[in-house]
């Protein structure tokens, strides 16, 4: 389907509610329809998924880092709308003093927080995103990434498992560990996210299984630090040490002034950081309006532990920072910390009141 045909399909879809539909007007499309990025990408590469899947929420992916400049007339409007900001003035990266971040374990008793996780997305600045990558390029990028993994030592040391040629036993174990990612998302597939699958894809994790990296899943890199309990300081420190090691190894990550770190989907850019806990809040969750109000006040997203649009199980919720854009990495983590502490405080109050009534 040509770029013009894709746009016609979108333009004629009266019931489509995506941000792409809202912001990719005919005037804006016509202004960029003949432009190409330095990686060879077109506006059609960016809008394809949203045109084929009219039930998309966002509907647009960047075909490569340069798309955020070449197709800024559409992408900037989508970004401002999605991230609820008036202007694109994302600050310079700042992870703070991660060796001594000013916080520790959010739940020393271990009675409420089941686990803690912080992840970031990062993109190599010298490679395009999946729609414009050849098989040779994605394999070369995987090689660059593996070379950086070899610099990991101490707690970060581990092993890389490529998806291509993975044994059934390895696949079974990684699935059991919830480490394996799949190629079954139709939005990502139509965006070109699974082109040349499974070449160039893989998973690195450390020996303790508290740090892992997804290579070329959706983004070039998804770095994830996690562990049982509420020790946010340890989780954040490990992640920051890994990012620093990779940058010191010579990797350069794609950024744009005002937007921060660039990702395949514009919904993730900025800090591209998500800090979360799985926490037991059965008493507060039973007071749905109050729970929602606290989450909104502190910019916390609450969802079921199996991801977006899933229900809570046994009063356990996934609580994370809602904002990715317009604040530093350290501020994003602090925002999650503050919100979680308030939720924890209220849960303890409600549990105490319940106990007093008995």
Swiss-Prot record:
ATP binds at residues 115-119, 178, 222, 274-278, 303-308. Its EC number is 2.7.3.3. It catalyses: L-arginine + ATP = N(omega)-phospho-L-arginine + ADP + H(+). InterPro entries: ATP-guanido_PTrfase, ATP-guanido_PTrfase_AS, ATP-guanido_PTrfase_cat, ATP-guanido_PTrfase_N, ATP-guanido_PTrfase_N_sf, Gln_synth/guanido_kin_cat_dom. Residues 112-350 form the Phosphagen kinase C-terminal domain. GO terms for biological process: phosphocreatine biosynthetic process. One of its GO terms (molecular function) is arginine kinase activity. It is an enzyme of class 2 (transferase). GO terms for cellular component: extracellular space. The keyword ATP-binding applies. Residues 2-84 form the Phosphagen kinase N-terminal domain. Belongs to the ATP:guanido phosphotransferase family. This is Arginine kinase.
């Amino acid at each position: 389907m040509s770029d013009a045909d894709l746009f016609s399909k979108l333009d004629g879809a009266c019931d489509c509610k995506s941000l792409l539909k809202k912001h990719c007007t005919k005037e804006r499309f016509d202004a960029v329809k003949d432009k190409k990025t330095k990686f060879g990408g077109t506006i059609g590469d960016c809008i394809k998924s949203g045109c084929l899947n009219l039930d998309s929420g966002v509907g647009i992916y960047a075909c490569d880092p340069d798309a955020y400049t070449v197709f800024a007339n559409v992408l900037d409007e989508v970004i401002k709308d999605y991230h609820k900001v008036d202007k694109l003035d994302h600050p310079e990266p700042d992870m703070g003093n991660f060796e001594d971040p000013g916080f520790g374990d959010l739940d020393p008793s271990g009675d409420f927080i089941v686990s803690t996780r912080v992840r970031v997305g990062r993109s190599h600045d010298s490679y395009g995103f999946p729609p414009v990558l050849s098989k040779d390029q994605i394999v070369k990028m995987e090689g660059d990434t593996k070379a950086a993994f070899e610099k990991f030592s101490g707690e970060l040391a581990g092993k890389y498992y490529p998806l291509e040629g993975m044994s059934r036993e390895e696949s079974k174990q990684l699935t059991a560990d919830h480490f394996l990612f799949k190629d079954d998302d139709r939005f990502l597939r139509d965006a070109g996210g699974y082109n040349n699958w499974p070449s160039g894809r893989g998973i690195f994790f450390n020996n303790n299984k508290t740090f892992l990296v997804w290579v070329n899943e959706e983004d070039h890199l998804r770095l994830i630090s996690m562990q049982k309990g509420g020790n946010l300081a340890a989780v954040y420190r490990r992640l920051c040490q890994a990012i620093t090691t990779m940058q010191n190894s010579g990797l350069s990550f794609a950024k744009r002034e005002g937007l921060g770190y660039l990702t395949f989907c514009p919904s993730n850019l900025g800090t591209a950081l998500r800090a979360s806990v799985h926490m037991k809040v059965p008493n507060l969750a039973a007071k749905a309006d109050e729970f929602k109000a606290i989450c909104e006040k502190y910019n916390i997203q609450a969802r079921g532990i199996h991801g977006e649009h899933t229900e809570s199980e046994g009063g356990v919720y996934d609580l994370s920072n809602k904002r990715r854009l317009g604040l530093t990495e350290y501020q994003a983590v602090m925002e999650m910390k503050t919100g979680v502490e308030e939720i924890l405080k209220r849960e303890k109050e409600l549990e105490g009141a319940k106990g007093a009534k008995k």
